[in-house]
UniProtKB/Swiss-Prot annotation:
Record-linked InterPro entries: Ribosomal_uL14 (IPR000218), Ribosomal_uL14_bac-type (IPR005745), Ribosomal_uL14_CS (IPR019972), Ribosomal_uL14_sf (IPR036853)
Molecular function per GO: large ribosomal subunit rRNA binding; structural constituent of ribosome
Family named by the database record: Belongs to the universal ribosomal protein uL14 family.
SUPFAM superfamilies named in the record: Ribosomal protein L14 (SSF50193)
Gene field: rplN
Gene3D superfamilies per record: Ribosomal protein L14 (2.40.150.20)
Domain of life from the UniProt record: Bacteria
Subunit structure: Part of the 50S ribosomal subunit. Forms a cluster with proteins L3 and L19. In the 70S ribosome, L14 and L19 interact and together make contacts with the 16S rRNA in bridges B5 and B8.
Keyword entries, A-Z: Ribonucleoprotein, Ribosomal protein, RNA-binding, rRNA-binding
Protein name, as recorded: Large ribosomal subunit protein uL14
Purpose of the protein: Binds to 23S rRNA. Forms part of two intersubunit bridges in the 70S ribosome.
GO cellular component terms attached to this protein's record: cytosolic large ribosomal subunit
Length: 133
């Protein structure tokens, strides 16, 4: 459950280490890139898109500190309840930085990601992830 002012770790190799959520979009990726989402949602869950500020970044990499980016939430500490009764939760809140078309800006994804990303058409992130839970 991510809301404004939530801090997220970054699960890709764009150079950012930490993000600060400034807006929850909650939209999904369609065939023509990102669709407009409601800008009035309070919480973001796995698979939702947030607008965030890079709070910590490695030098000489793809993103810089204080840059405003879009990211998709891939892990949350809040438990995810599935239709079959399974409950899954992660140790951290993490996101992957994406471009305007919904494709990841990095070339690698670190750590496990939730299967719910497949339902929201983030198949590129699923294919880059080492483990899908």
């Amino acid at each position: 459950m991510i809301q404004q002012q939530s801090r997220l770790s970054v699960a890709d190799n764009t150079g950012a280490r930490e993000l600060l959520c400034i807006r929850v979009l909650g939209s999904t990726v369609g065939s023509k890139g990102l669709t407009k989402g409601g800008g009035n949602r309070r919480y973001a869950f796995v698979g939702d898109i947030v607008v965030a500020v890079v709070k910590d970044a490695a030098p000489n990499m793809g993103v810089k500190k204080s840059e405003v980016v879009r990211a998709v939430v891939v892990r949350t500490r809040q438990a995810i309840r599935r239709d079959n009764g399974m409950v899954i939760r992660f140790d951290d809140n993490a996101a992957v930085i994406i471009d305007k078309n919904g494709n990841p800006r990095g070339t690698r994804v670190f750590g496990p990601v939730a299967r719910e990303l497949r339902e929201k058409n983030f198949t590129k992130i699923i294919s880059l992830a080492p483990e899908v839970l």
